[in-house]
Regions:
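Glycine/serine-rich phosphate-binding loop and adjoining beta1-alpha1 elements at the start
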Residues: 497-649
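Positively charged, amphipathic N-terminal segments that serve as targeting/anchoring signals
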Residues: 456-460, 464-469, 480-491, 631-647
Length: 651
């Protein structure tokens, strides 16, 4: 045996194979792929040398570092999804996926390359006052691309948005073609303008081929497994991702997800933006803001293809409403698990109620009155006939199903069929309370309210209750930092809001505005640090998402909900004023007021008190904070005493 000769022959064969593979890669991978991999030449060389090993291996690891992972694999249904599941809870800052347009020679399957980076910037690192040097030539090219591709874009925003992207990932901006940077800036701006949620599907041309591009922007996205959840949507809908570029950046206040997906059907067919599949994709992508991956509805029903994400979010809203409606009066009889098992263990009952809800509120429903009447009779019969032979459990579950039935029949309008939503809102006729049963309302004041609105979000739920048409009152958020705290707070939140709103109504007896109150429970039980950055981001997501949902249903035109995807059984304007209360930070006050004005609510910025302009009721004695402020001012002016530093006595 002449080993050196064998090695030389093997090396020659490997060199020839690598050159052939390199030529194949050059011809069958997107030009954008090579731009995205410009800083990974060793990984590209390794791919050319080793590509043939994919005949017998599922993956080739091309780069494996603390902050970067590059993998080559055989393209197959769910391959991206499987990789992200293996990555686990590592925070992804950048993800790039790209497929070949032809099967690999001698293998018979397409090539897929996945690049993941784990280098997220924290909010405090994005300092817009910091000087950065963005190449003038790059700035000119991006500006020209924006003028050409997005003529409506306000170019005065370019410097600020590009600087944010640069501070987050300078290397990506340097390597990206100006066209990609331009649409990234446009997408970032659209996300901001749309209240933190924007989705665009369009057919685009590339090298003479049309393909479907999905652009998705999410302000303050869910932090755990969000990209995995998005890929689960594509996988479940049998949509193939040909290539994708996704970033999670920080705007200095909270994270921001910016994603571009180039997709097709599993057989390579285009997905038309106005088609049924595209509509379903839009709904499911936006529902990722509402359905949590940790819930049983998601894990056992959505992932398994038994429920859509939309329907699962509705089931979770059913559970939250029934829990908050029944448990406050009888906490020993009704625990959270009783409501969960009523729906999760009996999906046939959940499906009946989902169908009834859809028949009542689907804006495109034909023959609504007849079909809804039939479905209502069927649902009522199923609820009353529910019997498993376990009397104690049957009584509990019938009470739960009756409550849910009242929820569906007494909701007057909802934003459920609005696609671009971050939370669910349900405006109810309070008459349902009289039908709940005396045992469930014995612990609340007898005076019936004028309106009840229920809100449900990925991270919490709560109510707004008003005792007159024109009403005002504060908005407080209870932060539950343990599972026990959340269950306890959620169990009593309805009674708390009801009593506070009724008390406010009595206080307002001498003015034209009736009393109201809004309170939410935030689930922060899985977060490590109380009051930390992650908790604040979640608090802002809950509040801003529910503010948007509030405006979805209460913005009207000629007395009807302006958004025609909302079936409105109430049909009148509802001027509701909100004041800040517990855990409503100054920045959120300004954000909600600005959002209300931009979206065209009847009260404009008047929706929220204690803004920077006008009379700030935190400073003028309307709240406990205001009382302290009054005391500070009085002591300083009358006695020359600094209430916070100087010793003093009261006589």
């Amino acid at each position: 045996m002449n080993l050196p000769s064998i090695i030389r022959r093997s090396a020659d064969a490997a060199r020839v194979a690598a050159e052939q593979n390199a030529a194949w890669l050059q011809g069958h991978m997107s030009p954008f792929f090579f731009m995205a991999m410009e800083d990974e030449l060793e990984a590209l060389a390794a791919l050319a040398r080793e590509m043939g090993r994919l005949r017998n291996n599922r993956h080739l690891i091309l780069t494996d570092q603390d902050k970067r992972l590059v993998i080559a694999c055989v393209n197959g249904p769910g391959s991206l999804y499987d990789t992200l599941r293996r990555v686990g809870d590592r925070e992804i800052s950048y993800a790039m996926f790209s497929h070949s347009d032809e099967s690999m020679p001698g293998i018979g399957d397409e090539l897929e390359v996945q690049r993941l980076e784990f280098d997220r910037r924290h909010n405090h690192e994005i300092d817009l006052q910091r000087a950065v040097e963005i190449p003038a030539a790059l700035l000119r090219k991006v500006r020209a691309e924006l003028r050409c591709s997005f003529p409506d874009f306000d170019l005065t925003k370019l410097d600020r948005l590009l600087k944010i992207l640069w501070l987050n990932n300078e290397n990506y901006i340097r390597m990206s073609p100006p066209s990609r940077t331009a649409y990234l800036i446009w997408l970032f701006d659209k996300g901001n303008a749309s209240g933190g949620l924007f989705l665009d599907l369009s057919l685009v041309e590339r090298e003479g081929r049309s393909e479907t591009r999905v652009l998705f922007a999410v302000g303050n996205p869910p932090q755990e497994e969000f990209l995995l959840q998005l890929l689960e949507v594509f996988n479940r809908l049998e949509i193939a991702i040909r290539r994708a570029y996704c970033q999670t950046i920080s705007n200095g206040i909270h994270p921001y997800f910016l994603g571009a997906f180039y997709v097709s059907g599993r057989q390579g067919e285009n997905i038309h933006p106005s088609g049924k599949l595209a509509d379903l994709l839009k709904r499911e992508l936006c529902t990722t803001q509402i359905i949590s991956t940790s819930t049983q509805a998601y894990k056992d029903y959505v992932v398994e293809g038994l429920l859509s994400g939309e329907d699962a979010s509705l089931v979770n809203a059913f559970i939250a409403f029934c829990h908050t409606s029944l448990a406050h009066a009888q906490p020993d009889r009704f625990g959270l698990e009783d409501f969960q098992t009523a729906f999760y263990d009996h999906p046939e009952m959940a499906q009946l109620l989902i169908r009834l809800f859809r028949l009542r509120f689907d804006p495109d429903q034909v023959g609504r009155e007849l079909l809804y009447g039939q479905a209502l009779a069927e649902a009522r019969e199923a609820v009353e006939a529910y019997n498993t032979g376990h009397r104690w459990l049957d009584d509990i579950r019938r009470a739960v199903y009756r409550c849910c039935l009242l929820f569906v029949t007494h909701t007057l309008k909802t934003n459920f069929f609005v696609i671009e939503k971050q939370a669910l809102a349900f405006r109810l006729d309070p008459a349902y309370l009289r039908q709940l049963g005396k045992e469930f309302i014995a612990d609340i004041p007898e005076t019936p309210p004028f309106r009840i609105t229920f809100f449900f979000s990925r991270f919490g739920a709560g109510y707004h209750i008003g005792f007159s048409d024109i009403a005002r009152g504060g908005w407080r958020t209870v932060i539950a930092r343990s599972a026990d705290d959340y269950i306890t707070s959620a169990s009593t939140i309805f009674r708390e809001v009801y009593v506070l709103a009724n008390t406010q109504h009595l206080k307002n007896k001498d003015i034209y505005e009736g009393g109201s109150k809004m309170a939410l429970v935030l689930d922060a039980s899985d977060l490590d640090q109380a009051g930390g950055e992650a908790e604040n981001c979640r608090l802002y997501k809950l509040q801003y998402g529910i503010a948007n949902a509030f405006l979805d249903i209460f913005i009207t035109e000629n007395g009807r909900a302006r958004d025609r995807r909302i079936v409105d059984y109430y049909g009148d304007d509802e001027p509701i004023e909100i004041g800040p209360d517990e855990n409503m930070h100054d920045g959120m006050i300004e954000a909600i007021a600005s959002l209300s004005r931009k979206r065209g609510y009847i009260l404009g910025v008047g929706i929220m008190s204690s803004k920077r302009f006008g009379i700030n009721h935190k400073e003028y004695g309307v709240t406990s904070i205001g009382v302290v402020a009054f005391a500070e001012i009085t002591m300083a002016e009358v006695a020359g005493i600094d209430l916070r530093r100087d010793p003093f006595s009261l006589k």
